[in-house]
C-alpha cells in the first residue's frame, strides 16, 4: 500500500514540475501577433475557401495588413469589405472583377448518387454538410458559403453548385428604406 502512495505522490510532483515548466515556457517564448491582423481576420467570414488567392483567411488578413487589396473576399461580400475599409482607414472598393457579377451559390448533393465517403464533409470549412460514413450526406443550405471546396474531392461527382433563389426566407429586407409616417397626436384646444 505504501508503494502505491509513494508512486501517486511522485507522479503528482512530477506533473506539478512539468506543468510549471510548460507555464514558464509559454510566457517566455510567447509569439506576439499583429493586433491589426487579428482584427481583420475577425471580420473575414472564416470559410478558408481560397477564393481570394490566399490559402485561408489568416494569410489574407496578413496580406491586407501588409497593404494588399481589401476587395478579394467573395463569401464576405460588400459588407465585409466595407468593414475592413473602415478598420484600415481606406476607401471602400468594388469587389474584384472576378467576383463582382457572380450569383451566390450553395452546394447541393444528389443524395441518390452519394456513396457516403465523407470526403465532402472533411473538405467543408464551415461544417455545412452532414452525414455519416457509408450513408448519404446533405447540405445545410443556410450554413453553406458557396466556397466550392466540396465539389472536387467527391469521387462520384454528385455535388452541384446551384444558385440561391430569392424567396421570403432569403430575401434581403431593407427595413431602414421603408418610409414610416409620423402622425402627430391630436392637440386639444
From Swiss-Prot:
Keywords in alphabetical order: 4Fe-4S, Cell inner membrane, Cell membrane, Electron transport, Iron, Iron-sulfur, Membrane, Metal-binding, Repeat, Translocase, Transport
Specify which residues bind [4Fe-4S] cluster 1 according to the UniProt entry for this protein.
49, 52, 57, 73
Report the SS bond pairs: none
- Its source organism is Shewanella amazonensis (strain ATCC BAA-1098 / SB2B)
Query: How the cofactor binds, per note?
Result: Binds 3 [4Fe-4S] clusters.
Check the record and name the Gene3D superfamilies matching this protein: 3.30.70.20, Electron transport complex subunit B, putative Fe-S cluster
EC class of the enzyme, as a word: translocase
| The enzyme's E.C. designation | 7.-.-.-
Q: What's this protein's name?
A: Ion-translocating oxidoreductase complex subunit B
Amino acid at each position: 500500500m505504501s508503494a502505491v502512495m509513494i508512486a501517486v505522490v511522485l507522479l503528482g510532483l512530477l506533473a506539478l514540475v512539468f506543468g510549471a515548466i510548460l507555464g514558464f515556457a509559454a510566457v517566455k517564448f510567447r509569439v506576439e501577433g499583429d493586433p491589426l491582423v487579428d482584427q481583420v481576420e475577425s471580420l473575414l467570414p472564416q470559410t478558408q475557401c481560397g477564393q481570394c488567392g490566399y490559402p485561408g483567411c489568416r494569410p489574407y488578413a496578413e496580406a491586407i495588413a501588409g497593404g494588399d487589396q481589401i476587395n478579394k473576399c467573395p463569401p464576405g461580400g460588400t459588407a465585409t469589405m466595407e468593414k475592413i475599409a473602415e478598420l484600415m482607414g481606406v476607401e471602400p472598393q468594388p469587389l474584384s472583377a472576378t467576383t463582382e457579377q457572380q450569383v451566390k451559390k450553395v452546394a447541393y448533393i444528389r443524395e441518390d448518387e452519394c456513396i457516403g465517403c465523407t470526403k465532402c464533409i472533411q473538405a467543408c470549412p464551415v461544417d455545412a454538410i452532414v452525414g455519416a460514413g457509408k450513408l448519404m450526406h446533405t447540405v445545410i443550405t443556410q450554413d453553406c458559403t458557396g466556397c466550392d471546396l466540396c465539389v472536387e474531392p467527391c469521387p462520384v461527382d454528385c455535388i452541384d453548385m446551384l444558385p440561391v433563389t430569392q424567396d421570403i426566407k432569403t430575401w434581403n429586407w431593407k427595413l431602414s428604406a421603408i418610409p414610416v409616417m409620423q402622425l402627430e397626436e391630436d392637440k386639444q384646444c
